[in-house]
From Swiss-Prot:
It is an enzyme of class 2 (transferase). The gene is metAA. Transfers an acetyl group from acetyl-CoA to L-homoserine, forming acetyl-L-homoserine. InterPro entries: Class_I_gatase-like (IPR029062), HST_MetA (IPR005697), MetA_family (IPR033752). This is Homoserine O-acetyltransferase.
Amino acid sequence: MPIKIPADLPACAALESENIFVMTEDRAVAQDIRPLEIVIVNLMPTKIATETQLLRLLGNSPLQVNITLLRTEAHESKNTPAQHLERFYKTFNEIRHGSFDGMIVTGAPVEHLPFEDVDYWHELLDIMNYAASHVYSTLYICWAAQAALYHFYGIPKFSLPQKISGIFNHDILLPDCRLFRGFDDTFTAPHSRNTEVRAGHILETPQLRLLAQSEQAGVTLVERVDHSQVFMTGHLEYDRGTLDAEYRRDVDRGLKPRVPEHYYPHDDPAAMPRMNWRAHAHLFYCNWLNYYVYQETPFSLTAIAQNREARAGA
């Protein structure tokens, strides 16, 4: 089944060229089923690239999904055309009185700052609190995962001596978790970050379960026991060339970055990067949509807030 997006969204043509099933709004109105309502809070500076990456994964599920793109008002984007934001994005005030089946909150390149110093921190707090009461399941990615763990559970982030960048192998700690249905015993995923959360803090928090970790990259997947929150410190959504673009950007800035690990053949940045996480990325997002959203969310969106209250009290 497809995702439903505007026909003139730049991602539409790109995804159709990759044989990803998308449906324009005009075609979708003829179908008499309730699609899932998913909101993507896009905090990345390269918003068009990020929305395309996530839509590629969401569009490969057997479910029809309505997508709402959300931006922050407190931060002015310098890397995305204003007309794109005005045409395709909403603000929190425009959606706060409704409910959603699922939410995805992306990472952001602000991890060098204390959380409270991020210019949209208070707005993000409102969004996260809203998600806790009006969204059935929320997926937090990279910095957003650290931000949510800090906000809801007081779990701190720690600076790393050097940036983690590359493709790393991960051990599945709870193979019966439905997010891992169809997974191999281990899986690879990209990481790109300067900070981490530590396993000990996760294990000390009774509302949370540590699902997967990497010997090199550390904590990777965490969930709240009622499935209402999923925290991913890596970037399964990344394209083949995303780490390459980040590496070359940092080289151009004179930062002397390390070559991303386990990424280029023979660690040669002139070679085409390997992409060995695509299958698990598609499977993870399909499992999240199906098992944590579609199979559990109420048919009526208006019942989500009541359902979330019941789950929180269970």
